[in-house]
């Protein structure tokens, strides 16, 4: 135990109070501005302007700090409108610039830790480098052998103060955290991190990166404790638990609460060896070979864990127990199922022959066409029935830019859903995007689609939409090598770095 305390103090000594001065550096907001311009093509322009003055941002920060220390807190109008002005400037726009700058500054300590990993100062383990590339092969390889799955909607913090308190143990700069807390409380448009949306929650488009950073950091905190409890049999010697021991408050909670006389009675549920956990954004799945009783215990453990340790209100209905054999798992834009595939084998014994029926489990990944059409409709590529429409916003672009944008969207979707065994849904998406592209070009040239395609040639669009880049991909070897099997084989492209915008329909 003394060794872990020394490691904890060593990590604390490596923290530096350097973040606060960076808030006043113009290049920080230049980085935030440039990063804001590199957005998804589906997002409309939110007001970034090359003529925006970084000096105005610095003046706003200086004024806010003055108000904070004078305890003379000004109030903004609750109307979330671009007409809201402060000191003669667009408050919403410049507040967005300030928070984007904060996102750049706060990420610096974690980026430095990543560099120390890459430089070999600390050991790099594969479980610290997991990405979306590893999720799809994991599902295909492991899920067919599992029985039950917990479909989890991760709870959100009740208040932003919880996120700031969690961040405090890593960022040892009290001044910058006080300023961050002041911003979060003074801006009404930032007072709520999450906005209700049906049965789940979603982040506002505005300043999504900064709030996602706070949210993901909070999720990482409780996942580190979750991993520690999962590996409790190693008595704190597990490499995957070292990051957990770098914390202060939760270290004390382990010492006072976990290591008690009821230690084994409380944690016996973690003995399950075939337990798999995957998370992406606000959803997670916990799959196991265990019984329904075991999964039910995990469910209520997670609810109590979030409420007692992180003060996050969680309801049992946000965690559903499903049996993989009769349930479709909605995860990462795929509908995944594990179905029994019957197999008849004829056996011959001298004069008698008989049939033996065997059933093997097969993991299927399907592209949900209805939600995808809904996403295309929301992006104005088609109507709610799937009939293609023109994209008037892009009509001012050049012909090559219009074709390139439509083609890039299709290639991204084609790569993302390459793991689906049934490709008919992709063909329908291709039809919608091709005709939407043709109608956009015809609208630009004030012509009909038929006349424009006759003049341009259908082959040009067809060739562009089928053009493939040189991208590494991953397949699983199969025993059969006939053409039908090759056509239906899953192909996992390694250029997927995040879930596609149109696939994120929730």
Curated annotation (Swiss-Prot):
GO terms for molecular function: RNA binding. It is found in: Plastid, Chloroplast. One of its GO terms (biological process) is tRNA processing. Pfam families: Intron_maturas2, MatK_N. InterPro entries: Domain_X, Maturase_MatK, Maturase_MatK_N. Keywords: Chloroplast, mRNA processing, Plastid, RNA-binding, tRNA processing. The keyword RNA-binding applies. Usually encoded in the trnK tRNA gene intron. Probably assists in splicing its own and other chloroplast group II introns. Belongs to the intron maturase 2 family. MatK subfamily. This is Maturase K. It comes from Rhododendron tsusiophyllum. The lineage of its organism: Eukaryota, Viridiplantae, Streptophyta, Embryophyta, Tracheophyta.
